[in-house]
């Protein structure tokens, strides 16, 4: 594991940290991606999935934030040998730092996501609760490349390189 990385402000002030769980399948690997909940992503699939992640406060330990977010979003406590995947910049300017680790979900796994409130429908004055994530699925590397937010594809490339090293 590399030295502790701390959050700093990106150009738009948003920095996130996340974890990419993978499992080996013969000569390939599968990765766990999550689908954002709420009405804006309800009918979106390809390009909408993401690694489990969350925003870090300035100066916060990024790997610790990534672990906290993973546990909050998926209800899974974890530990592992972390593979640093570096960072990417998403379309909106957010910087995302990521680490990968090998793991799996138990048969009895049931998604337990945090909830958020949103005025829905817009300008209705009604607040409705939605899950932060509504699905968590293991995808083959090939399918993950189509499902994941395009800006996060380099994380898959870096994981592939680390596993082939």
Placement of each model-derived feature along the sequence:
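Non-DNA-binding regulatory cores of transcription-related proteins
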Residues: 128-134
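Charged phosphate-binding loop/patch that engages nucleotide di/tri-phosphates or the phosphate backbone
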Residues: 137, 141-165
